[in-house]
Amino acid sequence: MPRFFARHAATLFFPMALILYDFAAYLSTDLIQPGIINVVRDFNADVSLAPAAVSLYLAGGMALQWLLGPLSDRIGRKPVLITGALIFTLACAATMFTTSMTQFLIARAIQGTSICFIATVGYVTVQEAFGQTKGIKLMAIITSIVLIAPIIGPLSGAALMHFVHWKVLFAIIAVMGFISFVGLLLAMPETVKRGAVPFSAKSVLRDFRNVFCNRLFLFGAATISLSYIPMMSWVAVSPVILIDAGGLTTSQFAWTQVPVFGAVIVANAIVARFVKDPTEPRFIWRAVPIQLVGLALLIIGNLLSPHVWLWSVLGTSLYAFGIGLIFPTLFRFTLFSNNLPKGTVSASLNMVILMVMSVSVEIGRWLWFNGGRLPFHLLAVVAGVIVVFTLAGLLNRVRQHQAAELAEEQ
């Protein structure tokens, strides 16, 4: 058994531990959402504080990006990620002992830092520890599994709270976090030489400046962040569109989200199982028409035959499938088609993505309340069309980088 563990630690148990950590982080929001009103009532707090459980979680996710990337470049990926898993576990456990809404929200913000550790350090380690094609396929598998959480989380949470107190849900998540912590401690490989670069404010600022001056990174960050807009704006505003304006029940609304997340899961499964080389430009360009057809359905369908949810869900799901086919490759290209410190590149990319997502959600919300469904969907269409041009720029820069590397080897 010890020999089997040693042989498969990096290739099997490390990805499993990371998936469990990522899955638990998602569940900490999705599992409690159906009972968030119960939380507010237990603490005799104002119901207007309910959305803060999500917004503060996201704020925690943005708080440490600037630090963790450069830090992991200098002291190693492993100590940073296992520290993050431990912090997440303790924050979930502490939630069981909260006695006020303020304490609960502080715990939620600390739990949100898991986004920083996973996205900035965990995903980079996967890409560094495995070859290009295997790394992309493994990330596709991780994404497929983790995206099950937004589908089953609310349904499972609602069912469990018929039998247990909401604090028990955080106990379950804390156990998952602890198991992932132990798994990462025992199985995570170290992909960075520790102490190779000293940690100083000057060197960190220099690294960030170099990243944001790199044109390949800028094209990659623009492509990825703009690609998120159609899905994230829909996920954020769809409750208002479908429940408040459309009259759907909460259970009906929950089922309308399944095709969107399910499309990404199916796309990632196809990449992991059937696509031999997901970095092939021809494969990448074949996914673009699928995205554009989905975006066209958002407008044309609602113009010709308006429906409460059909065209919006169908168009967004088709777009999600198309972009899901190439998302892992876009991340790989942006992170590794340069000679910059990967932790800093990952941190910079995540900061851009979160900023664009936040702004796009607010723009989408404004367009819906001031213009209605068609102006709201036009935001997705505009973002999707711009992505075609930024993707062309990214692939061109990647080709130049690969040609330069070949020339150096010869």
Curated annotation (Swiss-Prot):
Give me the Periplasmic side stretches, as residue ranges: 33-48, 100-103, 162-167, 238-251, 304-307, 370-373
Q: Which residues form a coiled coil?
A: none
- Say if the entry is tagged with keyword Transport: yes
Please name the InterPro entries in this protein's record: MFS (IPR011701), MFS_dom (IPR020846), MFS_trans_sf (IPR036259), Sugar_transporter_CS (IPR005829)
What GO terms are given for molecular function? sodium:proton antiporter activity
Record topological domains on the Cytoplasmic side = 1-11, 70-78, 125-140, 189-216, 273-282, 329-348, 395-410
Q: Does the keyword Endoplasmic reticulum apply?
A: no
Keyword annotations: Antibiotic resistance, Antiport, Cell inner membrane, Cell membrane, Membrane, Transmembrane, Transmembrane helix, Transport
Entry GO terms, CC: plasma membrane
Q: Pfam family example for this protein?
A: MFS_1
Report the subcellular localization: Cell inner membrane
Give the record's membrane topology: Multi-pass membrane protein
Residues crossing the lipid bilayer are 12-32, 49-69, 79-99, 104-124, 141-161, 168-188, 217-237, 252-272, 283-303, 308-328, 349-369, 374-394
For the biological process aspect of GO, one term held by this record is:
xenobiotic detoxification by transmembrane export across the plasma membrane
Q: Which Gene3D superfamilies match?
A: Multidrug resistance protein D
- State the family it belongs to: Belongs to the major facilitator superfamily.
What is its biological role?
A: Proton-dependent efflux pump. Confers resistance to a broad spectrum of chemically unrelated substrates.
Q: What is this protein called?
A: Multidrug resistance protein MdtM
**Native species:** Escherichia coli O157:H7
- Lineage, highest ranks first: Bacteria, Pseudomonadati, Pseudomonadota, Gammaproteobacteria, Enterobacterales
